[in-house]
Amino acid sequence: MPVSGLWFEQLEVGLRVQHATTRTVTETDNVLFTTMTMNPQPLHLDAEFAARSQYGQVLVNSMFTVALVVGLAVPELTLGTTVANLGFSRVDFPAPVFIGDTIHVVTDVIEARRSRSRPGTGIVTFEHRGINQRDETVCLAVRAAMMQCRPDPGRPDPGRPDPGRPDPGRPGPGSPEPERS
């Protein structure tokens, strides 16, 4: 798996990332997530019920929203460099998400320290903000993650090919030709 995330040393307090990927939420997203998580809330599933609510339409499941917000942050921030998600200290939904809303994410690094118990790792606290096309914040999530430190120069990076080591799936020089049938 390629590593495009940032190493612990690159995740300095004050770093702000405006993530490139956006996502328009579909009815299918909402129905699948809501039913897979066994949440029968009619605000998420019943258009007639939701039409009579203060919102006048179906609300997207808020747990889908937080999952989407964190997921949209992965490619530029943590892909291949996260050891573990440690938890959320805050999750707020200041505005609802509706079918057809397009979400983009801005992430700030608000804390970073080396792990005291796991050498080669650090603990980073991220503040992710999901923002819709009307520039309304729809989700604010503060989470801590254990992140890999940059590997030693003498060791290959995890997830990146080591040019000095043959790929076990490909024959190298002097290897017998594979049998052909």
Give the predicted meaning of each segment.
Residues 2-13, 93-102, 106-181:
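HotDog/MaoC-like acyl-thioester-processing domains
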Residues 1-87, 139, 152-159, 177-181:
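Hot-dog-fold acyl-thioester-processing enzymes
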Residues 89-91:
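Conserved interaction-surface patches within small, structured recognition/assembly domains
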